[in-house]
């Protein structure tokens, strides 16, 4: 991992993904840049978000983080993971056994996905999540989804 990598920010990003998928029915982000000061994620999205929607996502992420959920990782055969998750962001050499990160109870997690990154042990270690800004780039001609870029912070 990079010297400036922030496990709390990364774990908060997992919860942000879960909230966005649950609230809007979109796919998980397709691009992520995790930094200690401010991070950003990009979602394929059909429209811009209103300020009220952004605040609601921020509140929901904070509600999940404040539950003190365990963050754990378990191995899963690649074949099973391919049936349950989108593996397109994994490196080709990830192997036949993948590491699945769970936020919350692995039986009914708030979030679960293949991930090679470092994480906190409990969501309380993420601190407060702040939705700093977002911008929407409309879809290119012939496409139905644009890009919603979200910038956020986590920590105390």
Q: Where are the predicted features?
A:
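Active-/binding-site microenvironments in catalytic and ligand-binding cores
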Residues: 1-156
